[in-house]
Amino acid sequence: MKKILALLISLPLLGVAQNTVCFNIEANPNPNDLALTPFTKYVDVLGCFSIYAESTISNAKVKHAAAVAAELLDNNEDGIVDDPLIETQLISESALMPIFSSEGSSAENTFFINYNGDGVSAVLYKNEIDPTQTGHLGR
C-alpha cells in the first residue's frame, strides 16, 4: 500500500494540476504530536489526506500540493473521492504528506525521529513545488 500511496501522490506533481485552488490553510491541528510540532500549516484534502507544511512554505505552494492530491483523488471534481477503497485506506493509515523547507532541515529530522505511523505517502521540499509551472518540476 505504501508504494501505491507514493505513486498516487508523487507522479502527478510532474503532471498538470488544476490552477484554481479552493483549500483553506489551517493551523496544525496536532501541535502536541512530537512528529508534527515543526509544522504550522495544515490542509485537509477531502477528509482522507493531510498536508503539513513548515511556516517557510508559501501558502500558494501548500495549496498547490493540496490541489494535486485532490485532483488525483477526485478526478471528476464532484467533491467525493472517486475510489472508496482508496479513501478508506488513506483514512485508516492517517495518510499525510509533509512539506519541508529543505532536505535535512531540523523539521525533517524532528519529523522522522518521532513519526511512528505508516501514512507518509510522499515527502516534498519547497524547491520541488512551483504552482506557476504546473506540469514541470519546480526549481
Task: Please place each PLM-identified region on the residue numbering.
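Sec-dependent N-terminal signal peptides
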Residues: I4-L13
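Acidic/His-rich structured neighborhood in mature extracellular/periplasmic domains
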Residues: L46-R139
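Boundary at the C-terminal end of the N-terminal hydrophobic targeting segment
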Residues: G15-A17
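Ser/Thr/Asn(+Pro)-rich, low-complexity disordered segments
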Residues: A27-V43, K61
